[in-house]
Amino acid sequence: MAKIRPPKPKRMGRGAQRCQRCGTRDAVIQKYGLYLCRQCFREIAPTLGFRKNR
């Protein structure tokens, strides 16, 4: 039987960055070194000092 190697960790592309809070790989905000997904950013943004521009 053949040996199965574990997959290599991704280093480039959309799947390489993960949200530090929930671990999802969709819509990760990397600006300012945040590495949060869109949903987590909306929950945490007021505590970080971000405001809505309206």
UniProtKB/Swiss-Prot annotation:
Keyword Zinc listed: yes
Cofactor: Zn(2+)
GO biological process: cytoplasmic translation
Keywords: Metal-binding, Ribonucleoprotein, Ribosomal protein, RNA-binding, rRNA-binding, Zinc
General function of this protein: Binds 16S rRNA, required for the assembly of 30S particles.
Family to which this protein belongs: Belongs to the universal ribosomal protein uS14 family. Zinc-binding uS14 subfamily.
NCBIfam families per UniProt: PRK05766.1
Protein name listed in UniProt: Small ribosomal subunit protein uS14
Organism this protein belongs to: Aeropyrum pernix (strain ATCC 700893 / DSM 11879 / JCM 9820 / NBRC 100138 / K1)
